[in-house]
Amino acid sequence: MKKKWSSIVLPGVSFFLLSTPSLLSQDIQIRTDKTDIGEGQNIVVSAIARRSDGQPAAGVMLHAIVNGKPWGAEYPTLPSGVAHLLLPLPDRGANTIAITDGSATSNTATVQVEPRHFDIVDDPDHMVIMEYETWFGPGYAGWGKEEATPILGRYSSLDPRVVRQHALWFNEMGFNTVELDWTNNLTEAFPSPSGKECIAATDLLFQVYAGMPQHPKVLFMVGPEHNLWRNLKDAYTGPWFNQQMDYLYEHYIHNPKYRDIYVTYLGKPLMLLYLNGPRTGPPPEIHDDRFTIRYVGAWQQAMHQEQYGVWSWYDQSPTPTYYQKKAEALTVTDGYPAADLSKRSELDWIDWNAGGKNDGETYRSQWQVAMGSKPRFLFINQWNEFVPPDQYNVNLSNDMEPTLLTEQGDPRASGWGFDYFNITRDEIAAYHRQIESRK
């Protein structure tokens, strides 16, 4: 039976100011817009919260409990006591959902989540790769200064549901591969405390992927010894670096449990070595017979390391790197900081040479270069850094993971929703169509 949902209007009052212990809800009722979805798809849970006197509980922060565990971002109730929570559901089978404010808990609703098949183009000559962070945990990268709030909330990279949901999103967009960022692990002996957390998150990712019928392949990007490399005068390798490379090879790449998950190129596993930022001049010469090695810099439009075969983390103007007269690698991004090495990094995003998202214009224009170059490896910058100085605000950012569109009065910035998810899915599909049409 449907209940009539009454509302109140409080002119000129921010309803977030009303969220006090005395006004916490005593009753929460929910309903869902769907009872059956495919894995990774969204439902909307509509909730209404009332105080003990029966009036709407305005400004109360609600969050979901799915199969007994917290899931997703918090949503505030409106002056009517209503909130609409958008929830992706990654786990197959029956998902039992309740909503709580930490005091009262709603009735439950059940949504059945079914398997899906994704039409991912498998073209080893034109791979599309998302730059991906798995660093969100208690001792590595924390939350609190993100430029926008992910739909999944302030999640942990150690939560298998998060890893699975990200993988399902990558599948839906059409990605072949994710690039895992291991560039910050060697400021002390390997494995450092943060390195151990990175290992735990990577263990989980490989385990989750191994259990999925469709998933992206994996590619590592590592950094230099002591997290320091400026030019050929600095040593890139050392005992910590070598220990980490051995660990990656033995634990993941050469592990029979994870057969066929890792990317190979020119007959060997591909390993990316980050040059610790934008640099000029040639890269170091690192030799390891186990790997095909490529180096990654940034801002090639100014540094021009592509002439030495260096790939890019991102560019203001996408600049392809060639190998044997063919475009080998290119990176496109939806936003970029300025390329001024004379300034502190926290000023890069507010420099007049920086480029914001601009409602997708930056991203779409960079994709045009990819359409023309058609590289062997097309990198997309990026999914989810969410920390300063790498991101500045909602526009001056290059994160793409779906984020909340917040209501007026919510102190959290209103993000970009699924805009860059949708653009990416459409551009990848168009990219493969164009390649196929010219064969």
What are the language-model segments listed below?
Residues 35-41:
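Short, solvent-exposed loop/linker segments at the N-terminal edge
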